[in-house]
């Protein structure tokens, strides 16, 4: 499990003081950074190897500006060329959002998926 702390910004709030729903998927992506490094250690797009093929977000509770959030990220399932990431956002000990992302190990030069290495 990977734990990532994020401090909400004023610009991420809406008119009633909640964190706007569009930022939850962005925060989830921030939590995937170390998983990205497994496939592209330098995080450079010349050698990028992942294609996002599905993302789901479930909003469970409200998020606010006043307290930092914790993104919890883990790999749930690994297939031949794809893997599934489970994600949660917690704030003040409350589960506020959960999601899932599926990535394919992808060769962009050859335009095709590739098997995930055991390394």
Name the predicted role of every residue range.
Residues 1-54, 108-119:
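Hot-dog-fold acyl-thioester-processing enzymes
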Residues 1-4, 63-65, 76-119:
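HotDog/MaoC-like acyl-thioester-processing domains
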Residues 35-83, 96-98, 104:
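Hydrophobic beta-strand-centered segment that forms part of the acyl-chain substrate-binding groove
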């Amino acid at each position: 499990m990977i734990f990532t702390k994020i401090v909400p910004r004023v610009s991420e709030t809406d008119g009633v003081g909640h964190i706007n729903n569009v930022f939850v998927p962005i925060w989830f992506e921030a939590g995937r950074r170390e998983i990205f490094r497994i496939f592209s250690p330098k995080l450079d797009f010349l050698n990028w190897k992942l294609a996002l093929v599905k993302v789901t977000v479930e909003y469970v509770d409200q998020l606010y500006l006043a307290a930092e959030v914790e993104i919890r990220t883990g790999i749930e399932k690994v297939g031949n060329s794809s893997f599934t990431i489970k994600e949660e956002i917690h704030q003040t000990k409350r589960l506020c959002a959960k999601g899932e992302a599926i990535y394919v190990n992808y060769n962009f030069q050859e335009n095709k998926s590739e098997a995930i290495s055991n390394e």
